[in-house]
Amino acid sequence: MYVRHLGLRDFRSWAHADLELGPGRTVFVGPNGFGKTNIIEALWYSATLGSHRVGTDAPLIRAGADRAVISTIVVNDGRECAVDLEIAAGRANKARLNRSPVRSTREVIGVLRAVLFAPEDLALVRGDPADRRRYLDDLATLRRPTIAGVRADYDKVLRQRTALLKSVSGARFRGDRGALDTLDVWDSRLAQHGAELMAARIDLVRLLAPEVEKAYQLLAPESRSAAIAYRASMDAFVAADDAAPDRVALEEGLLAALAARRDAELERGVCLVGPHRDDLELRLGDQPAKGFASHGESWSMAVALRLAAFALLRADGSEPVLLLDDVFAELDAARRTALARVAESAEQVLVTAAVLEDIPSGWDARKVHIDLRDSADGRVSAVQS
């Protein structure tokens, strides 16, 4: 798989761009702040419908514009597929697949399968559980695009149940049985959709675990062994290492946990149980990586998580595109060499770098120099001619 064409309209610092790409390695070179990362961000958005830098779409639209457009042509096994995404301010986003409108933007997920390495990856180890949940959910969705619908259904139920919790927090004292019966209905829906999302995550962690261990050993052979595990918000939940998750058991466990925590939830007006409270536990030896790993070990773990994702996507039978956003500058020589070795085997690698010296020596790569220019639209990014 590779991206043959990337078009941008009013995306971040790019008023207009049409980039012809191909298999092999392409390096986007330019000073920081000139718009290199925006290219990688656009490709990642096309793959996942989300940015790796911000949680909302508004910052993606260039100042003064009312929408941004990302257009890609992806080649997979000789077949071309065109995806156009319109990111709108204050209204629903739109998508077209092979120039035909689709009902939901989620229908384009899976056309471009990519793995992103970025400086923000350190948050996978040192950041909040939300960063690790997003890593799992993005990868699960790339492997099985229907997971996007599962995530959307769960998020919708979670919002509605949380709103109900806030509105009925005093119902048990007023004896309002009707309000509590309504909460029972939302408990059932949350457990149903939550169990489906948890099952997808747990199965993914089961497949990722040996790949993470192997990748970490490659990156840091002198360090402690690495391990990952799924940690649920349900008390006493332990995911089996070698068995597919039981969705029925997960649903029953969620219902029991919701019943046990209801008083606390009514007191606080928040949902305390469910996959939105779960975490991916990262361990080095017998210690958690967060808080105990050195800076180098943290980077090795973060890169190992991305390498494991690359291995899984490749094993699924479709070569993912590698997106490397200024990551070589963050790594020492050994980790840089290990990552470069993996990148050499990929069908397409798209890299950003502030200076060419950040790129591994001996790399045969096309160089695209990025500039920042004054125009009628203000200062905009441009490709040097």
From Swiss-Prot:
An annotated Gene Ontology molecular function: ATP binding
Pfam families (UniProt xref): SMC_N
Main localization of the protein described in the UniProt heading: cytoplasm
GO terms under cellular component: cytoplasm
Cystines in this chain: none
UniProt-annotated binding residues for ATP: 30-37
Location relative to the cell: Cytoplasm
Keywords of this entry: ATP-binding, Cytoplasm, DNA damage, DNA repair, DNA replication, DNA-binding, Nucleotide-binding, SOS response
BP GO terms, sorted: DNA replication; DNA synthesis involved in DNA repair; double-strand break repair; SOS response
UniProt function note: The RecF protein is involved in DNA metabolism; it is required for DNA replication and normal SOS inducibility. RecF binds preferentially to single-stranded, linear DNA. It also seems to bind ATP.
Similarity remark: Belongs to the RecF family.
Protein name, as recorded: DNA replication and repair protein RecF
Organism name: Mycobacterium ulcerans (strain Agy99)
